[in-house]
Curated annotation (Swiss-Prot):
This is Cyclic AMP receptor-like protein F. The keyword Disulfide bond applies. It comes from Dictyostelium discoideum. Residues 1-3, 60-83, 167-187, 256-267 are extracellular. GO terms for biological process: adenylate cyclase-activating G protein-coupled receptor signaling pathway; cell surface receptor signaling pathway. It comes from the Eukaryota. It holds the Pfam family Dicty_CAR. InterPro entries: GCR1-cAMP_receptor, GPCR_2-like_7TM, GPCR_Rhodpsn_7TM. Disulfide bonds join 81-177.
Length: 318
């Protein structure tokens, strides 16, 4: 228990700072906002609140609120641990679902881009750019699509967390306040989405990587189209990195909960889960800070060179 608390004390504050870094820079710089980075922004919000669970866990530990147990009964659960368990389930699912929507987004945009390249329609060929009515229509389409993503993610998380709460299944667990009982069937409300999202994300990533390896930019395309295709490719790779981080950092939690359900010794995975899940937000912030778009923007802010036409520099922006 003390080892877990120590891990939370080290990892959680760093990860929360990482999430805030993404949130603040996204809000400050319009050039970082596009149809893909919207997903990164909302995942960062989910990460921030989910990681704050670990700060609350530390506080509960030092004020002696029970939250670590392998008991299967939830009859003695205090309201504080119950509330933290519900909070954790909601934002944990939000982190998972926003990661999954990134997978869907990059898969859809990649094959949408392939169709546009085949038609060689340069004028309407950008994700968030263009001109005149095409730009306005495209932005309206993006806004409507994002609304559906919001409805899916937040609606799913609310229903998922509420059903478990109504059934009074939140309480102390091996890693803090969550769903009580290692072999509690209600844990499949967490495991099934994890199994599904991790499996489909791996399959989609492999398919896209194979396609990207086979596809080669055409030197016959106009300069602007070539630059756009390169930038679009860079941004898809960035989104894929976020998806890969989700797979890597949530895999230990998936293995842990699966082993717990079957009653297998899992001390190593308890500690690994504490490290990986609490550090996911930090890993996301590192990908965000090292992206070509962010680095170019920061370079221009620091060097302060005028007339660099940032509107044309990143054509994939809205």
């Amino acid at each position: 228990m003390k080892d877990i608390i120590l891990i939370y004390m080290i990892c959680a504050p760093i990860s929360m700072i990482g999430s805030l870094f993404i949130i603040i820079t996204w809000l400050l710089y319009a050039k970082l906002k596009n149809s893909g980075s919207n997903f990164i922004f909302f995942q960062a919000i989910s990460d921030f609140f989910f990681t704050s669970k670990y700060i609350i866990t530390i506080i509960f530990y030092y004020i002696n609120i029970p939250q670590f147990s392998d008991e299967t009964s939830s009859t003695d659960t205090n309201p504080y641990c119950f509330s933290l368990g519900l909070f954790s389930q909601f934002f944990g699912q939000a982190t998972i679902m926003w990661s999954y929507t990134m997978t869907v987004k990059v898969f859809h945009s990649y094959f949408e881009m392939k169709k546009k390249n085949n038609n060689n329609n340069i004028g309407s060929n950008n994700i968030g750019g263009g001109g005149g009515g095409n730009n306005s229509n495209k932005q309206n389409s993006i806004d409507k699509t994002l609304k559906w993503y919001h409805l899916f993610v937040w609606g799913f998380c609310l229903v998922n967390a509420t059903i478990i709460g109504i059934s009074k299944q939140y309480g102390p667990s091996s890693t803090g306040c969550w769903i009580v009982g290692a072999n509690n069937p209600y844990r499949f409300f967490e495991l099934v989405p994890l199994y599904f999202t991790i499996t489909t994300s791996i399959i989609i990533l492999i398919l896209i990587l194979v396609k990207m390896k086979k596809s080669k930019p055409s030197s016959l395309l106009p300069t602007e189209s070539m630059r756009y295709n390169q930038q679009a490719r860079e941004f898809k790779i960035q989104l894929m990195k976020f998806v890969l981080i989700f797979i890597i950092f949530w895999l230990p939690a998936t293995v842990l909960r699966t082993l717990e359900y079957f009653g297998i010794e899992k001390t190593f995975f308890i500690l690994l889960d504490a490290v990986s899940v609490s550090l996911q937000a930090l890993a996301n912030s590192l990908v965000w800070a090292t992206s070509p778009q962010f680095l170019k923007l920061m370079k221009r802010k620091v060097v302060n060179k005028p007339n660099k036409q940032m509107e044309r520099e990143y054509l994939i922006n809205k």
